Amino acid sequence: MMTRQSQLQRLQHPTQKSLKKQSLEVTVFDDYVRPNEVVESGEFDANYFQHIPYLDQFNEEKGTHLVNAGGIHYEPFGIYPGTKDSLDDLKDGDSIAVPNDTTNEARALLLLQDNGIITLKDGAGLNATVKDIAENPHNVEIVELEAAQVARVTGETAYVVLNGNYALEAGFSVGKDALAYEKSDSEAAKTYVNVIAVKEGNEDSEKIQALVDVLKSDEIKDFINEKYDGAVIPFEESSDAEEIDTEDADDADSKDADNADDTAEENADTTDTAEDAE
């Protein structure tokens, strides 16, 4: 979830502008259950609030038939400066603070691995803990803390690993301050990307494809990059996703989503999108 305000509420204006031949109605829910129920029942066409593990768990527990129609954005973990402001300055015995809850710790460790600081055991993946560290060439000390406490030890550890929300609360900008962050082709980004969810069988419908195409358009990507300064990153399906360039994002001009218009229905149909707000 991007913020306490709804995702599609913030994206509604640029999205509606690009849909042109269809109208988009956004309804905000204040829980994580009802948005899936109304899509399952057919009352709404789609929702946009959840990542794939939650969607899969919901289907298993509730017997629903919801599927991922397209990944739109993810909120990256980043390595931020503590007492050192460059990963090139890493020395033997340096300490790195990470969140200690299961999911967040695994993402932090994977990010450290992606940057050559540690190596995890094969298959550890998103269940990794410090016990899964197979190689630690710099003998770094992994300091495990409650997630909200990690940003408070920047004066005590060489680096800290934070998720987007806590980075923002600590005054960090992903685009300007992160020494490294999760890329679209990372295991974590592919798993925790926020998706458009629809009832099985509707994922290839013309209006759902029009919605997904618009939300993945250059215009919406530019909007997200400008609005969130790296705290939220458009998800790229390709494995060679480009790194975010906040300077380019600041200068980006709005682009027309002509491809989405080509796929939109000829009649002015309505896409009802259920969405959760934190």
PLM features: residue spans?
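A bilobed periplasmic-binding-protein/Venus flytrap-type ligand-binding module shared by bacterial periplasmic
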Residues: 76-87, 192-205
